Amino acid sequence: MAAKQVLFADDARVRIVRGVNVLANAVKTTLGPKGRNVVLERSFGAPTVTKDGVSVAKEIELKDKFENIGAQLVKDVASKTSDNAGDGTTTATVLAQAIVQEGLKYVAAGFNPIDLKRGIDKAVAAAVVELKKASKPVTTSKEIAQVGSISANSDSSIGQIIADAMDKVGKEGVITVEDGKSLENELDVVEGMQFDRGYLSPYFINNPEKQVAALDDPFVLIYDKKISNIRDLLPVLEQVAKSSRPLLIIAEDVEGEALATLVVNNIRGILKTTAVKAPGFGDRRKAMLEDIAILTGGTVISEETGMSLEKATLQELGQAKRIEVAKENTTIIDGAGDGKSIEARVKQIRAQIEEATSDYDREKLQERVAKLAGGVAVIRVGAATEVEMKEKKARVEDALHATRAAVEEGVVAGGGVALLRAKQAIAGLQGDTPDQNAGIKLILRAVEEPLRTIVTNAGEEASVVVNNVLNGKGNYGYNAATGEYTDLVEQGVLDPTKVTRTALQNAASVASLLLTAEAAVVELAEDKPAAPAMPGGMGGMGGMDF
C-alpha cells in the first residue's frame, strides 16, 4: 500500500481552498450575458471553446493533490446541479466558493464548524421557502423562449426554437438535439408514435419516391413471438382481406414461408401488408408492444395470456389513421386507442419514472411517455465549423434543460435578484447559538455573490450595483446585457426556480462539508527510478546520413 500524507486543520483547509478558488475562478468568468468563453485543450483535434460552467469544471484536474480535493468537491457541486436541474452550474460554483471563503474566516476565528453548518442549513431552508413563494408558473410560449434564451447565453434564436418545439410536442414531449447539415438551426417534428424498426422486406414499399410503405386506415396485428408458419396467420389474413384494408404486422420476427407469402400477396395486390420487428428487447419489448396496443386500441396476442395467433379476430387488432414504414423506423399516426386508456398508461409510466434509479431507465420511460402523448421533436443545430457546432450544441442542451425545469417549478427573476431578495427571509432568522448566527450571516453575504460576479463580468462596480438593487423591491434588478436597472421579469430575464434552488442547496451542502473537515489524506507520489539508458548503436555505421 502506498504511503499517505496527512494534513490537519488550517494547513489542510488552506490548501483545499486554493483548489476551490482555481476551479471557481475559471468557471465564474462565464457567468452572465457578458461572461467570457473558456478554451479547453483537447488531446486530439481542435480545442473546444465553451461558456458552459460544468464543461469547464469537468476539465480541471490539479497537480497538487490537496488543491485537487477542493477542485473535485466544487466540480461535484457543478455536476450534481447539472444532473438535477440541467443548468445553474456556474451559479452553484460561485455560491460554493463564497460559502467556503466566508466560512473559513469564521473557522479561523475559532467558531465551531458544526454549528456554522447548522446555521448555514437553516438559512438555506429559509431561502428556498422564499424562492418558492416568489416563483411564478410558466404558461406562455414567450416565457419559455425567454428562459431558453437566458440559459443559452442570451441567444434568442435558441430560446425561440425550443419554445416552438414545446408548442409542437407538448411540454412532456421528447426533444432531442442533433448535429445539423446547414448553417441555420432547424426543427423537425415526428408526429405520432415512432419506433426504430423498419420493413422486413423492401418489396413492401409502395411509395418508391419516399422509399416507404404507406398504409392508410390499416389494421395492426401485434404478436410477441416469431411467425414462420403461414397457416397460423391465414385466419386473420382472410378476415382482413374481406375488409379491403391494409395490415401492419408487428412481431418478434416474420420469416421463411410466412414472409414470402406476405410479399407475394402484396406484389399481386391481393392484400396490402407490411411486417416489422417489434421494438426493444426483453421486458422493454413487452412494455412497448403493450404501449402500441393501447395507442391503436388493439391487444397484444400472447400465449402467456392464453391467446393464439390462429384464433385472432379483427376485434383484437389495433387501428390507426395512417402508418408509414421506412427502412429503419415505423411511424403510427393517429392511433384509434381510447383516450382514457392512453391517459391511464401515461400515468402508470410516470409512476415508474418516479421510482427509476438509473438515468438510462428514466430516459427510456420518458421517451415512452412522449410517444404515447404525441410526438418527438428534433432540433438540428447549424454551425460553420465543428468547434462552433460543439459549443452551440452544448448551449442548446443547457437551454432545453432550463426550460424543462421552468415548466416543472416555475420561474423567478434572473440576474441573481431572486437570491438577493431571499436575504429578507434569512435576515429574520435566529440561531440557537452565536456560532449558528454566524452561519446564517455567512449565507446573507454568499447570496450576493452571483449578482456581484455577473456585474464584474460586465465591467461594472459590483458593490454599487448590489446596493442599488437592494434598495429596490420585487423584480427590480440590473440587466447586465443592456446595463440598465429595470423590472427583470418584464424584460424577460428569468431563471427557473428549480435551477436557482438546486444551485443554492448543492453549493451549501458541499461547502459546509468542506468547512467541517479537520484533516485531509492524500497518496504520496512514488519516486520511480529513471529508465535505463538505451544501448549504443551498431559499430561501423558511421558516415550514414539519416
Swiss-Prot record:
Signal peptide: none
InterPro entries for this protein: Chaperonin_Cpn60_CS, Cpn60/GroEL, Cpn60/GroEL/TCP-1, GroEL-like_apical_dom_sf, GROEL-like_equatorial_sf, TCP-1-like_intermed_sf
Localization in the cell: Cytoplasm
A single Gene Ontology CC term: cytoplasm
CDD domains membership: GroEL
Positions of ATP binding: 30-33, 51, 87-91, 415, 479-481, 495
Pfam families the record matches: Cpn60_TCP1 (PF00118)
Record field: transmembrane: none
Enzyme class label: isomerase
UniProt keyword list: ATP-binding, Chaperone, Cytoplasm, Isomerase, Nucleotide-binding
GO molecular function: ATP binding; ATP-dependent protein folding chaperone; isomerase activity; unfolded protein binding
Family: Belongs to the chaperonin (HSP60) family.
Biological role stated in the UniProt entry: Together with its co-chaperonin GroES, plays an essential role in assisting protein folding. The GroEL-GroES system forms a nano-cage that allows encapsulation of the non-native substrate proteins and provides a physical environment optimized to promote and accelerate protein folding.
Protein name listed in UniProt: Chaperonin GroEL
Organism field: Bordetella avium (strain 197N)
Taxonomic lineage: Bacteria, Pseudomonadati, Pseudomonadota, Betaproteobacteria, Burkholderiales
